[in-house]
């Protein structure tokens, strides 16, 4: 069995199945707003492994330490202590939803720090502080899919 990989990370089999069945799609603003209420801007469900890989290219953002701190991006492999929320470990994350409008800098990502097969789901939060923090949406991807009704 060939595993679907994005940036070396295996996509959850449920996501692979949803993509193959063309069921990985936006459930409507009202439903998405109940699952991720702190994101007000429109989001796009990334429709392919290629789009997820493009959205998950962190290199430009992580090279500037001030900007990386502002958006709470870090490389876990370079951290002396375990990296926890509100930080996003860019080496252990894949974007699955992104801003509809460039520059809105909103996103939803799989966070593999908790599981390689059913990672938790995080979303950016620009509402609570002057910087981007990462918050848990659901403890697993399967719970995220269930809440969305996909």
Language-model features: locations:
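Low-complexity, glycine/alanine/valine/leucine- and proline-rich hydrophobic stretches
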Residues: 95-97, 105-116, 123-125
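Generic preference for flexible, low-structure residues
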Residues: 27, 31-35, 112, 124-126, ...
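A surface-exposed partner-binding patch
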Residues: 1-103
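Compact, glycine/acidic-enriched structural inserts
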Residues: 122-150
């Amino acid at each position: 069995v060939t595993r679907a990989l994005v940036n070396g990370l295996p996509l959850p089999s449920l996501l692979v199945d949803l993509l193959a069945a063309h069921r990985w799609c936006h459930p409507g603003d009202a439903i998405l707003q109940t699952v991720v209420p702190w994101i007000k801007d429109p989001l796009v469900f990334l429709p392919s492994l290629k789009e997820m890989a493009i959205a998950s290219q962190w290199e430009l953002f992580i090279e500037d330490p001030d900007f990386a701190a502002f958006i709470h991006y870090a490389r876990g492999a370079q951290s002396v202590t375990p990296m926890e929320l509100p930080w996003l470990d860019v080496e252990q994350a894949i974007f699955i939803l992104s801003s509809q409008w460039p520059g809105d800098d909103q996103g939803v990502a799989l966070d593999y720090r908790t599981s390689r097969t059913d990672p938790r789901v995080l979303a950016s939060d620009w509402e609570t502080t002057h910087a981007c923090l990462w918050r848990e949406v659901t403890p697993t991807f399967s719970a995220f899919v269930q809440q969305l009704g996909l």
